[in-house]
Curated annotation (Swiss-Prot):
Residues 128-202 bind DNA. It comes from Penicillium rubens (strain ATCC 28089 / DSM 1075 / NRRL 1951 / Wisconsin 54-1255) (Penicillium chrysogenum). Residues 61-116, 210-255, 528-547, 769-795 are annotated as: Disordered. This is Conidiophore development regulator abaA. Induction: Expression is also positively regulated by stuA. Keywords: Activator, Conidiation, Nucleus, Sporulation, Transcription, Transcription regulation. It holds the Pfam family TEA. The gene is abaA. Residues 237-247 have a biased composition (Polar residues). It is found in: Nucleus.
């Protein structure tokens, strides 16, 4: 029977940091990159003693810098720390045996030339602004990598985001991405000249500093070849011999690890991006390990029975540069809790966001009874030189919330109070019990599938475990109360708000290693998008834009009484037939009746314009257009119908387009499917023609408006004459209040306009000025049709 984890034997995560293997365990995996395959294979078939011996051998095989006692003075401490770091970097460079380094070193034979070695052996006397040599060993290595990544481009430029960059600028940017240290374009150019002085003529050097076809470099405006490292970043699928140099530590030291389904794509960092976030970060060190200890062994990673994963790379330096959060594929679905924090505009993110990619190497069998699962998670807020800048040791009320998701669905949510730290290190909890149960369950499923004797069942169990880890993600949030918040809370006893400050967010992604791989964990910083409140956005519209006024509307505009409603100009309302049908906005019908359409109630003033200059096509429409465009269920306001009887032999020479009534001059149609404007005919205008004024009031159709509003027929043809004298017609319109109630069509009764017509003397003067010729409307003496008994509903 398979043994299970013993909960009482689980290693607490509040223990002190684990001691290294033979004082060198943190370097063992880094320096044994070439032995990853054999190391993992031997671990799978060796007992505990053999593993122990091998770890000690690895520690002696790749020794560290000697650990000198640190002096008490701060300057001496800093110098010793810097010297140790430089020595470690030299060892890493000497033991770098990754395929990319080998291929690069093999091609760059000049690096082994006597002149180059003598140059590098000289003491570095020139120092940069950061206090380090301008071209230290670290920067020199990054410089050589930048030469490979950025091919020669002559006088041409590489254009990106609207700016042009020369090769030296690209090299300087590349060096900054690898080392975090700035070197200017001039420093790169000077270094190239120095190296070219004694490496000129070497084929490998010439290949890196000069183009193959010199005649092409004379074209200033030609398109420069894309830097290989940028091409690889923009197109992860594109093959590039330098694609893996983006993260040299990760790829060089774990060459057996290949991209897998669910990996994050390589990021693309535009030039000029704010990569100084790492310098201003609060977290300066990170450590994470997960292992199994045998019952009789010490609770240490170097004595581990099995290591699920361990941190790969330097504890204080991520293996990859910071990456924008938006470049993480599917981060919103993988980290819902983080997405809610980013979207919270009231609480902008002001802490480090750490992305951890955990590769777990599962055990092939159950551990012995009494085995213990250990998880060590440390965050170091101490600055390498300044120390406890944030005052972490003075903070209280440390809390850690953990959200674990499977396929974006939350499967676990916990909250823990952390003990107050006495140093700059914080040790969050990472649910040891949950992980122990998970590993036991997965191991049990695998054993049952293997014991069944069905190879397909074993493969299915392995695929199930791999798919589970790919769909697994987690988000942790660390909060603490600064001393200033505690003082404020003490001063104001009534204040019960949340004074805690968000200190860090950890975003976890997981996968299961392939056979022969060692479980490792990498970490990098994520840069969230800028706060929405600090980014530029379009200014809101301060008001409604009104359409420009036509020239006729401006010329005909006159001061009028405040209570008079003025209709829009018809030539502003009429569309050309070729234009598409538009939906005209409906507006509240005016409460002015026909009697109030003129300036004075006593007589008609045909010489005064009743146009409203500020009304246009985009603001309001005539009442008739409202009836045409909408269903009859809308009850529009209307006025009583009128009748006109009387002969007239005068031609029509005037068209007044200041009234919103439906008539042939306006050119509307009344059918619901034909509810659009059509252009009216152009009429000869004579402002003293009273017959044309009356003709503008009333259409020539004999069909009632009630029938037209329900059918498809348009207005009838123009009538050619008006039988009878206009003056003989009798019109009456009863007085209507200013705010009248809409009346249905069935209840309307005919009325007359006698009270609205001018005096007979004025009418004689107007009629006397008319000519007897036929007009374009066919309303002259030769007209055949008339207006007898014609009834029109005025709307």
């Amino acid at each position: 029977m398979a043994t299970d984890w013993q909960p009482e034997c689980l290693v607490t995560q509040n223990q002190t940091s684990l001691d290294p293997v033979g004082a060198h365990s943190d370097r063992a995996l880094q320096n044994t990159t070439g032995n990853v395959q054999s190391y993992s294979d031997q671990l799978a078939h060796a007992d505990i003693t053999a593993r122990e011996d091998q770890l000690h051998q690895l520690g002696f095989k790749y020794p560290h810098a000697p650990h000198h006692p640190q002096p008490l003075s701060a300057p001496g401490l800093h110098q010793q720390h810097v010297a140790a770091r430089l020595h470690q970097r030299k060892l890493r460079r000497l033991h770098s045996v990754g395929p990319n380094s080998q291929s690069r070193r093999a091609r760059s034979s000049y690096l082994k030339s006597q002149k180059y070695l003598e140059y590098r052996a000289r003491p570095r006397r020139d120092t940069g602004k950061d206090g380090e040599p301008v071209w230290s060993d670290e920067l020199e290595d990054a410089f050589q990598q930048a030469l490979e990544a950025n091919p020669p481009m002559g006088r041409r430029k590489w254009s990106e985001r609207g700016k042009s960059y020369g090769r030296n600028e690209l090299i300087a940017e590349y060096i900054f991405k690898l080392t975090g240290k700035r070197r200017t374009r001039k420093q790169v150019s000077s270094h190239l000249q120095v190296l070219d002085s004694f490496l000129k003529g070497d084929p490998d050097w010439e290949r890196l500093v000069r183009e193959a076809s010199p005649e092409r470099s004379s074209s200033v405006h030609g398109s420069a070849p894309a830097p290989k490292w940028r091409t690889a970043m923009e197109h992860p699928s594109a093959s590039s011999h330098y694609g893996s140099h983006t993260h040299p530590s990760y790829h060089d030291h774990m060459r057996s690890m290949q991209p897998y389904a669910g990996d994050l794509p390589p990021p693309h960092y535009p030039l000029g991006s704010n990569m100084q976030e790492a310098a201003a970060s609060a977290i300066h060190g990170f450590s994470f390990d997960m292992w199994v200890s045998a019952p009789q062994q010490a609770n240490r990673l170097d004595k581990a029975l099995h290591a699920y994963t361990r941190l790969q790379g330097d504890l204080h330096h991520p293996v990859a540069p910071p990456m924008p959060l938006e470049h993480v594929s599917g981060w919103r679905s993988s980290f819902p809790q983080l997405a809610s924090m980013v979207d919270d505009i009231n609480n902008p993110l002001d802490c480090d966001i750490i992305l951890l990619e955990v590769n777990l190497e599962l055990m092939t069998d159950f551990p012995p009874a009494g085995s213990r699962l250990g998880i060590q998670l440390d965050l170091d807020y101490g600055h390498p030189t300044a120390g406890d800048v944030l005052g972490v040791s003075q903070m209280d009320n440390w809390t850690c919330s953990t959200h674990i998701y499977e396929d974006s669905q939350k499967i676990l949510e916990t909250y823990h109070d952390l003990p107050k730290t006495q140093s700059t290190k914080v040790k969050p909890l990472f649910e040891s019990s949950w992980w122990a149960k998970l590993f036991t369950q997965l191991t049990q499923e695998k054993r049952m599938a293997e014991d069944s004797g069905n190879p397909q069942a074993a493969r299915d169990a392995d695929d199930h475990a791999r798919h589970f880890f790919r769909s697994l993600s987690a988000v942790q949030e660390l909060r603490a109360t600064p001393p200033s918040s505690r003082r404020l809370s003490t001063q104001y006893q009534g204040h019960h708000g949340d004074e805690s400050k968000r200190m860090a967010i950890l975003a976890w992604k997981f996968r299961q290693t392939r056979p022969g791989e060692v479980g490792t964990t990498t970490w990098r910083r994520l840069i969230p998008a800028p706060d929405r409140t600090t980014t530029n956005s379009p200014r809101p519209v301060s008001g409604v834009d009104r359409p420009p006024l036509s020239l006729d509307s401006i010329l005909l505009n006159k001061p009028s009484h405040q209570g008079v409603y003025q209709t829009p100009q018809p030539h502003d309302l009429i569309h050309h037939p070729s234009q598409s049908h538009s939906q005209w906005p409906m507006y509240q019908s005016p409460h002015d009746n026909v009697a109030n359409l003129f300036n004075t109630p006593g007589h008609l003033d045909f010489m005064t314009s009743i146009s409203k200059a500020e009304d246009g096509l985009n603001d309001k429409t005539a009442v008739t257009s409202v009836l045409d465009s909408f269903s009859t269920s809308l009850a529009p306001e209307s006025i009583p119908s009128t009748s006109l009887h009387g002969p007239s032999g005068a031609p029509v020479m005037l068209n007044v387009h200041d009234l919103p009534l439906s008539h042939p001059g306006m050119g509307y149609t009344m059918g619901h499917e034909a509810s659009h404007y059509v252009p009216s005919q152009q009429h000869s205008v004579n402002m003293h023609d009273s017959n044309s004024v009356l003709h503008g009031f009333f259409g020539s159709n004999t069909q009632p408006l009630d029938d037209l509003s329900h059918g498809q027929a348009s207005w009838g043809a123009h009538s050619t004459s008006i039988p009878g004298d206009v003056g003989a017609g009798s019109y009456q319109l009863p007085y209507q209040p200013e705010h009248h109630v809409p009346v249905s069509r069935e209840s309307q009764q005919p009325h007359h306009f006698d009270g609205l017509l001018p005096s007979e003397d004025l009418m004689d003067k107007i009629v006397g000025r008319m000519s007897n010729g036929p007009s374009i409307h066919g309303a002259g003496p030769d007209a055949s049709a008339g207006y007898d008994n014609a009834t029109v509903d005025a709307v």
